[in-house]
Amino acid sequence: MVKLRLKRCGRKQRAVYRILAIDVRYRREGRDLSKVGFYDPITNQTFLNLSAILDFLKKGAQPTRTAHDISKKAGIFTE
């Protein structure tokens, strides 16, 4: 199963996150299938590749709660 989840990057006390499509069998820092976004909680910047995210969601990928919330704020899940 593929999930959309966050991977921690950056330095101590200055975390930034990449939003990845990754197989659930791999750990958080493991091998990813694709990088689909970026999130910086300190400056509140978000970059999302909408076409890649929608493509993975159509194929059955499940976002984690945090990845879902970030995507929802960006307007992906407008229903």
Swiss-Prot record:
Induction remarks: Transcribed and spliced in green leaves.
Localization per record: Plastid, Chloroplast
Gene Ontology terms, MF aspect: structural constituent of ribosome
Keywords on record: Chloroplast, Plastid, Ribonucleoprotein, Ribosomal protein
Listed GO biological process terms: translation
A Pfam family per the record: Ribosomal_S16
GO cellular component assignments: chloroplast; ribonucleoprotein complex; ribosome
InterPro entries: Ribosomal_bS16, Ribosomal_bS16_CS, Ribosomal_bS16_dom_sf
Gene3D superfamilies xref list: 3.30.1320.10
Keyword Zinc applies: no
Organism superkingdom: Eukaryota
The keyword Ribonucleoprotein appears for this protein: yes
Family: Belongs to the bacterial ribosomal protein bS16 family.
PANTHER family: 30S RIBOSOMAL PROTEIN S16, SMALL RIBOSOMAL SUBUNIT PROTEIN BS16M
Comment field (misc): The nucleus encodes 2 genes for bS16c that can be imported into chloroplasts in vitro (At4g34620, AC O65686 and At5g56940, AC Q9LTS6).
Record-linked HAMAP family: Ribosomal_bS16
Protein name: Small ribosomal subunit protein bS16cz
Organism: Arabidopsis thaliana
High-level lineage: Eukaryota, Viridiplantae, Streptophyta, Embryophyta, Tracheophyta
